[in-house]
Amino acid sequence: MQLQLICEDATQIDHLNDLATRWNLSHDENSDFALVLTCERLELRKVDEPKLGAIFVDLVGGAVGHRRKFGGGKGQAIAKAAGLNKGATPTILDGTAGLGRDAFVLASLGCKVQMVERHPVVAALLDDGLQRAQKDPDIGGWVSERMKLIHASSHDALDKLSNDPNFEQPDVVYLDPMYPHPENKKKSALVKKEMRVFQSLVGADLDADGLFEPAMKLATKRVVVKRPDYAAWLDEQKPSMAIETKKNRFDVYVKASMT
């Protein structure tokens, strides 16, 4: 993956070089995207649209922190979909981790969550946010214990895991593929900004249907797929049930009882 690699803190140039090596990133001064290491964090900027601001992972404050404190606990839709309302605390594999928000919610409710993010730039942002969260005095302990990023940014990561006899299968596989976004649908300013930047960097998950089969193979108890309310079922597979919210729904494919 080629994009601008910029270090704003001269003391961290070696760290940026390590990141580039780890995530197979190379510098391209003509790219519209810049991955910038500041003195505080790693962030993504769209150089030709500076008004969009920077995208970075913040699991401590902002909207994510607010949701952790006031988001409704095990009664919220994502928790019900994952089976937490059954009294279980399942192990979860988030196969489309993105900026880690949903994984963080599930981890804050007690679940051990392994995350796969196949795009190297997004994975680098998530890894940076995780490392900062691990140092936070309030949440660092359980973030370190419950959230793990699997360094597999290839498109066949789920396939590889499902065929790996040494990989411990999770109770639940959670998927939230990026869906092409109709212009007439309202989104919050933050989500709009992120979707615009991500869809131009990553593109919609046009091969998302291919995630369904390995997800079903991996999960021991259920697969949960988050979809916009207007979207079709993943891979045209009818779910066992759906939990609907105002703008989204969680399609649940049950394989076995949670208890």
UniProtKB/Swiss-Prot annotation:
Native species: Vibrio atlanticus (strain LGP32) (Vibrio splendidus (strain Mel32))
Protein name per UniProt: Ribosomal RNA small subunit methyltransferase J
Predominant localisation class: cytoplasm
HAMAP family: 16SrRNA_methyltr_J
Gene Ontology CC terms, in alphabetical order: cytoplasm
Residues holding S-adenosyl-L-methionine: R101, D102, E117, R118, S153, S154, D176
Record's function text: Specifically methylates the guanosine in position 1516 of 16S rRNA.
Subcellular compartments: Cytoplasm
SUPFAM superfamilies: S-adenosyl-L-methionine-dependent methyltransferases (SSF53335)
The entry's keywords: Cytoplasm, Methyltransferase, rRNA processing, S-adenosyl-L-methionine, Transferase
GO MF annotations in UniProt: rRNA (guanine-N2-)-methyltransferase activity
CDD domains hit by this protein: AdoMet_MTases
Similarity field: Belongs to the methyltransferase superfamily. RsmJ family.
